[in-house]
Amino acid sequence: MAEHGHNMWEEEPSKGRDSLDSDSSASTTSLVFDQISERVAAESGTTKGKRMRYGHDEADLGARLSELDDEDPLKDEASGDYDLETGPFLGGHGHNSNHDGLSAASGSAGKTQGGYRMMDRGLRRVLIIASLVFVTAWVGGLFIYISHKSYLHGSEFEHDPQATVSRGSLRKITREQVDNGFWRPVKASIAWVAGPAGEDGLLLETNASGASDKAYLTVQDVRSLQQGLDASTEAAVAAARRTLVEKSTFTFAGKTYRIGSSKASKDMSKVLLGVDVQSNWRHSSTAAYFILEVATQTVQPLIPGEVSARVQLAQWSPQSDAIAFTRDNNLYFRQVVAGSSSSAEDADSVIKQITTDGGPELFYGVPDWVYEEEVLGGASATWWSPDGRYIAFLRTNETGVPEYPVQYFLHRPSGAAPAEGEENYPEVRQIKYPKAGAHNPVVDLQFFDVGRGDSFSVAVSGEFADENRLITTVLWAGAQKVLVKETNRVSTVMRVVVVDVAARSGQAVRTVDVGAIDGGWFEISQRTRFIPADPARQRPDDGYIDTIVHNNGDHLAYFSPPENPEPIMLTAGPDWEVDDAPAAVDLERNLVYFLATIQGITQRHLYSVRLLDGGGLSPLTNTSEPGFYGASFSAGVGAGYVLLEYGGPNIPWQKVMNTPAAAAAAAAGSADVSKQMPFVHVLEDNHELAERARQYALPLLVRGTFDVKGHDEGVGAGKLNYLERRPPHFDPSKKYPVLFQQYSGPGSQEVTHEFSVDFQSYVAASLGYVVVTVDPRGTGFAGRSNRVVVRGRLGVVESHDHIAAAQHWASLPYIDGDRLAIWGWSYGGFTTLKTLEQDAGRTFRYGIAVAPVTDWRFYDSVYTERYMDTPQANAVGYDTGAVTNASALAQNVRFLIMHGIADDNVHLQNSLALLDRLDIEGVSNYDVHVFPDSDHSIYFHNGRQIVYDKLENWLINAFNGEWLKIDNAKPQGKR
């Protein structure tokens, strides 16, 4: 092609072809027919040597055939030699002995000329006609070949996630690449921080690599990322730059410590350093803490005289002069005075113990297991007031919560040495774990008055009983008021309470019974945002932004003052929802930023809207193309900068930009917002990943929806989103097996426009199977009516939808309906087994369940009862949702279960209960693999690697028909 500098009739050298055979044969054939073409051209008076063009006048060529009958097209005029195989141009000049032999042998078969056998005229005519037909076809094929850029190697094309045909011969992706992060997009991490005076656009930079030419912890102006700043900007950037911690190690009392975590005070004069950090549950950990003075780079222990004290949580006060921390489940207050002594004698003068009865069953300021996992989503249950006068904290009483034993056979997470003679016994960790219907922890909110030194709680009339209360949100709404959101234990009724801490009183300002509205539940969110009063900016009262149920979806509402139960709706839908909103609030310009599904539920774009009236909805991202974006905003009051993350469908990238200009450009209708920014810095473009995507054969992706019929229990028809991954060299005339991968949990989403090369991609691209992901009803972002249909019957609707999906794909001409498998992890493992049970071998043949729930009575109360109510109130729903029909599972060809023995989340009890039921019923068409000492993630001693090794090999055997052979095994010779 012209853009490559080649004449369209010259073949480009192949780049990295798997085989050169086709090129060689094509070249040889073309040279043969070039000779024929030259003769035709010569007889026609055209320039000798010019190649035949596609579309020549075939009638003219036909008229010349009779004149060519008497000529041998392979004769070399200079030598007079002939070779019917190769012709003289390939050096195949005839040898007289051969020709003589041929002539003698042929005898009367034809006339000879100059000692050579003459070809029969009729035969020559047939050969020439056939040759010209072949030439025409060959030239036509060459035209198509070049016009489609088939001469280019696949790696010369950009990766196209929307491609539906192969890009040619490329390298195969490998399991090792998927496992080791080769295909994982690089993501830079920015820790935004507000300056001491609320300055915007500052970030904390941690030298995690330990490079000797960089300080360990520094503060930078985000504009320092960009080159070529003007003098005034450079001066401002330099003024903002400061070093907080010089080195990644420090020495105290002759011992050197390596920093494991760091938390700077608000005024940036001190840093809290954690060393010897030890993980506890998903979010929590313990560490020994030191306080570093930035000016002198000197340290002192958090607890004077106790350098190695294990602390669960430590938080700076907003005034940077105190730290609240929890140790052994008790809450403490520590004054931080510059130059104070680190001796044990000074401990009493700087530390005050706020609570004294904390212990194994009573937690202060930190959550227990279920609150960490299901409610707060973090390790802190401590909240400082903005002026540092009060500390709000949760008291969690687990006295009535039953224990579950987690066994560790190969290591001892506690670090404690066993008693002599007990070395060969497992370590058992007893966890207070409330299962569905069991006693919940009793949680109440308490306050500590720093000035008065006393603790207190505030009773509010109409509150839920202790056993029926979940405190889901605690938010300071100014210096003296706290906004508290609480629900009943089954999450159908929510109360919003405003506590006046100074007056030690409170009132319920809003109560919503969503169960009565749509039969659903409240999802827990920690994104509620306080909006301070600012009369100069038309905000006469304090307020808050919350996500509420509106127009069949999750939408943003602005309540001001906080006691006002009637909000200003900032978003309304009705055919879209917000996601984990708000992302940020610009208090200087009264703008609210959020991610939403306006362009489709598989996409996320960033938008802004006016705070005061909900008007002026504007995109900050390019909505003309599919995209899945994320956003992290700067911590200043103006939220003036954003780390914008493009996650797909093309190669992911990250840019830092300033938001006011972005909003203005979007409002002006700019087609490419990013190019209109006064400040735009590409933080990561993933160019290496883009190059890999060009060089490797990635699966072909097909996204869409398909119709699903209504369920017989009052669930109407609907549309389900799917993602189909096809092999790179997909051939619709073939029959492919299908692996269905899913999660399916309430409110979750698997089918998106994100870029991903994962295990599913490997199965499609390198094993050659079709892999399909479907989001059934109950999953997220398709409207409340789509979600709440699973309430009270988890697994029933989801399995119905997956069976419908399997039936749909089985009906497609390129699918082998006898080779369908489904797999999933956690909730996906549950859905796998429930689908196999409900289908009973009619559609699916195989399944793999990793760490599955098998009976919702075994899972934690907060999560389960939100969707199922209690077992006492919904016994039928729990019975229906449990995987218990062993005879139905026996109808499948085979299934595989894998589980970690030390799973503290989905207990091994789930798999054991099912195995027992299978034993009772005499069912044996399954395999089991357990992982000692592995938790829900299955990492211990190479566990994660083995999970996917097992999954891959087991699946190959399934689709190869190996499990059919062992269904009725017989000794050799007895068949």
Swiss-Prot record:
Kindly list the GO CC terms recorded for this protein.
fungal-type vacuole membrane; plasma membrane
- Region described as Disordered: spans on this chain: 1-111
Keywords of the record, alphabetical order, are: Aminopeptidase, Glycoprotein, Hydrolase, Membrane, Protease, Serine protease, Signal-anchor, Transmembrane, Transmembrane helix, Vacuole
> Where are stretches of biased composition, namely Basic and acidic residues?
1-20
Name where it's found: Vacuole membrane
Catalytic activity of the protein: Release of an N-terminal dipeptide, Xaa-Yaa-|-Zaa-, from a polypeptide, preferentially when Yaa is Pro, provided Zaa is neither Pro nor hydroxyproline
Amino acid composition bias (Acidic residues), ranges on this chain: 68-84
- Give the EC class as a word: hydrolase
Vacuolar compartment residues: 147-975
Task: Please describe what this protein does.
Answer: Type IV dipeptidyl-peptidase which removes N-terminal dipeptides sequentially from polypeptides having unsubstituted N-termini provided that the penultimate residue is proline.
Q: What family does this chain come from, according to its entry?
A: Belongs to the peptidase S9B family.
Q: What is the protein name stated in its UniProt record?
A: Probable dipeptidyl-aminopeptidase B
Source species of the chain: Grosmannia clavigera (strain kw1407 / UAMH 11150)
